[in-house]
Amino acid sequence: PNNRYAKAENVDDSDQDARDYINSVSPKGKIKDELIETYISEGPKMIDYLHDNSQVKYRNLAHYPDYFPDNPGGKEGNRSMEPEPINGTQLGNDLGKLREQHPQTAFTMGPINMNFTQVEGQLLLGALPGWKTLFAKLFTKYILDLPMRLKWGWKDRRLTMGNAGVARLVLSLKD
């Protein structure tokens, strides 16, 4: 809650809303109040530190709601984040050490394993307006990436979701 990416989009959130929501979804007495307070106060600082001192960058997920958005303090979106996509070839040979994304977070068809972001996934899997154009763009870019196909087989150089997060952490360690 209250991270820099949501604030950049002028999202209405507060520490009290976050506290109310956490308390509404947690079994009473199972999480110490001091841990909740630490999460609320220090979580945004951790995100700021990573943003300012590493290659770890996120994007706000405006349409990804809390699990129970109707609970006290719940929100219809803007609390979740995902790592910014990154070109995996920046990892050099370490790209080969990175596991494929989970099949539920990529378009998998035979040997093809094409990555997408959560926002793209919502559009594609929901067959929302524009999904065909997006799919054609992603698929064409993926298939025509001949250097990648020749060196790494069907691995997608465009890393998203967890793989993007891991890649950004690895690159930060190398800096």
Predicted regions, residues:
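Conserved N-terminal/central alpha/beta ligand/cofactor-binding core
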Residues: P1-D175
